[in-house]
């Protein structure tokens, strides 16, 4: 087997092992589901996003909020995954072994990220289904949604590498990642954001993704 075949096997192995491990310990998925739905419930109760009806001339503004929320979940998953993976490897003393491995580090961590995306997709589907029943949101899936979400995820993964480096340097991984995830919720038009802030955050992948997703929806 050639080198490319070996790298693919290692990539697939990382995906499979992390996915099965996460499924086996379901508490993390269940807690994520509860937190995501609870936070979305807050936005629905406070009627966040009603300004989108005028901005996009679209009556079903709750769908636009849900779209932004889905994009945000993928974005924070990218950041938390790479930061968490690096922190875990450092804690267990295995990072330097992976750095010196014959396989590129991006393949090893990339497999973990793909597994994370698959798990988050399951969680997102459940959140969307529950939201449709509880809040009566008319949500329609468009295949075109996949392109901006994919590009956003890759962009946010790159940002996640930078964030992880900073967080590990200051030894405050959890705190820094949490603050950035929270900030992204309110400065990227995931929920209505002022034009002044959007002028600054316009080029963040999540902000662009939210804009494109809503344009597709309407």
Positions of PLM-derived features:
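Aromatic- and glycine-rich beta-strand/loop motifs that create alpha-glucan
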Residues: 1-34
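Membrane-interface helix-capping segments at transmembrane helix termini in multi-pass transporters
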Residues: 48-67, 130-145, 217
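Hydrophobic alpha-helical transmembrane segments of multi-pass membrane transport proteins
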Residues: 62-132
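Alpha-helical transmembrane segments and their short interhelical loops
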Residues: 105, 110-175
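Transmembrane helix-boundary elements of multi-pass transport/secretion proteins
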Residues: 21-89
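Hydrophobic alpha-helical transmembrane bundles that constitute the permease/transmembrane domains
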Residues: 26-29, 33-37, 78, 113, ...
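Transmembrane helix segments
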Residues: 168-203, 207, 211
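Structural signal for membrane-spanning alpha-helices in multi-pass inner-membrane proteins
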Residues: 39, 43-47, 72, 76, ...
């Amino acid at each position: 087997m050639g080198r490319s075949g070996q790298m693919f096997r290692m990539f697939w192995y990382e995906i499979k092992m992390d996915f099965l491990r996460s499924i086996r310990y379901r508490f993390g998925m269940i807690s994520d589901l509860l937190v995501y739905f609870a936070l979305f419930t807050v936005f629905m109760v406070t009627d966040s996003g009603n300004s989108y009806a005028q901005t996009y001339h679209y009556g079903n503004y709750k769908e636009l909020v849900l779209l932004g929320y889905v994009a945000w979940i993928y974005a924070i998953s990218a950041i938390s995954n790479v930061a968490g993976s690096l922190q875990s490897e450092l804690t267990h003393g295995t990072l330097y072994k992976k750095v010196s491995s014959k396989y590129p580090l991006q393949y090893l961590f990339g497999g973990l990220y793909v597994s994370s995306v698959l798990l988050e997709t399951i969680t997102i589907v459940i959140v969307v289904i529950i939201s449709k029943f509880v809040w009566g949101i008319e949500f329609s899936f468009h295949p075109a949604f996949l392109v901006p979400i994919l590009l956003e995820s890759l962009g946010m993964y790159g940002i996640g590498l930078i964030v992880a480096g900073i967080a590990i340097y200051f030894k405050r991984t959890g705190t820094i990642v949490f603050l950035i995830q929270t900030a992204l919720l309110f400065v990227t038009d995931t929920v209505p954001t002022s034009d002044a802030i959007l002028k600054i955050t316009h080029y963040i992948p999540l902000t662009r993704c939210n804009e494109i997703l809503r344009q597709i929806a309407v």
